[in-house]
A protein has these predicted regions:
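Hydrophobic alpha-helical bundle cores within soluble ligand-binding/oligomerization subdomains
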Residues: 1-173
Length: 173
């Protein structure tokens, strides 16, 4: 990258997330990649659609953006936090991926970061392929390994119960 670390927004955001300067260029590159892969889903997703509808209804910029932001949730744009909690708790508690899947199935609960309406095993999300490559570049990736173990089980049940882009982001960060 031609940016210096001081002018690199990805490095600055990474430092803000970590609470310190990042030690690894790979970490900064991962954060930059996450932003690039997450920035635009087109006008058909709820956050974009509600922003457009609100603006066309005559509301101002702030109201329109707020309308879009209010639709971020577990089914669109907000699954990263739930997925991060799943992977972190699973690893910290020494669970096997099968334990998490069984617990959620018995409770009839979704697993954050698992599942997609469009993508499935035979039609993978190209963003997840790019993100998965980062796991091979990290010194350790226990959360990613745990999440992939969950995916291995869930995709045996249904092909679209893949580790989605939010699940990948959560597992890598």
């Amino acid at each position: 990258s031609s940016w210096s670390a001081e002018g690199d927004i990805a490095a600055q955001i990474t430092a803000g997330i970590l609470g310190r300067s990042p030690k690894s260029a790979v970490t900064i590159e991962l954060v930059r990649t996450i932003f690039l892969l997450s920035v635009d889903h087109g006008p058909q997703v709820s956050g974009a659609l509600n922003t457009i509808i609100t603006a066309r209804a005559g509301k101002g910029l702030v109201d329109s953006l707020a309308a879009g932001l209010m639709t971020i949730g577990p089914r669109f744009g907000g699954a990263v936090s739930d997925a991060a909690r799943e992977w972190f708790d699973g690893v910290q508690q020494g669970l096997e991926p099968a334990d998490l899947v069984e617990t959620r199935a018995k409770a009839k609960q979704f697993i954050g970061g698992i599942g997609h309406k469009k993508y499935r095993l035979d039609l993978p999300d190209p963003r997840t392929t790019i993100l998965a490559e980062y796991a091979t570049r990290l010194d350790a990736h226990p959360y990613f390994d745990f999440a992939k173990g969950v995916e291995e089980i869930t995709t045996q049940k249904k092909g679209n119960l893949i580790l989605n882009v939010d699940g990948h982001i959560a597992a890598l960060m």
